[in-house]
Amino acid sequence: EVHSDRYFKPHFQSQPVTKDKEQDLYDRIARALMLTDVEREHLFLLGLGRAPEVRYHRSEGVTPRLQRVLDLLEPHPAIIRTATWDVVAWNRAATVMLTDYGALPPRERNVLRFMFLDPRVRAAQHDWASVARFVVGAFRVDAARAGAAAEVQPFVDELCRLSPEFAALWRDNDVRAHGEAIKQLRHPILGPVRFEYSAFAVDGRSDLSMIVYNPVDPEVKEKIRGLMEASPAHEHA
């Protein structure tokens, strides 16, 4: 068994120790040993007593198993989104109640794009101004937590150019937590509907979150089933 105190820490005894130097040494060890992300994190916890700085990995999709989980949640709308709020998976209930993600190019499947650039999504919000402020604040937190601040900057710059409202909210530097709450929508067919929503981390995929929407009114579930039966099916991605 390799003990990190014995083999790694003496490297620093004859020179000033900085966080960057420690991070660099342990990163080099992890690369030399070809450690997985989980093994790399364990190495840092053993040697430094803390997790390493987050390394962001862009997600392009989900496994078939995760997609089956989403499908089994129907008629509850559910999506999986990245730390940069790109929607990478969804079920048919989400298609009929939220957005027809399958009809959009992958680049356009972003919650902030919907919120600030799609008039239909804006009109569907019960209180667009409050929802928009929450979305921007929660997005800022998620991107920073995932170590994706640099990756999202071009997207943020683009959205600032396209939406003065987004630009103003971004300048406010507000931060929000994404947990559990009530979402109210104006659906074009069902009218006003309310959902309890919860956000869940996807185990082993720190870059992904699953959002599940539970209808507050029980009769809405059967109405969602009816919409699903009447709507053509799209590919998941």
Give residue spans per PLM region.
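Functionally constrained cores in energy, signaling, and assembly domains
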Residues: V2-H3, Y26, G47-G49, H76, ...
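Small/flexible residues
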Residues: F8, H42, L185-I189
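Short, flexible active-site loop motifs that bind/organize anionic cofactors or intermediates
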Residues: P16, A30-L33, W85, E180
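Recognition helix of helix-turn-helix/homeodomain-like DNA-binding domains
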Residues: V2-D20, A30
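Residues at alpha-helix boundaries and short interhelical turns
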Residues: P16, L33-D37, G102-P105, A146
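Hydrophobic protein-protein interaction segments
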Residues: S59, P64-A237
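Short amphipathic recognition helices of helix-turn-helix/homeodomain-type DNA-binding modules
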Residues: K21-G61
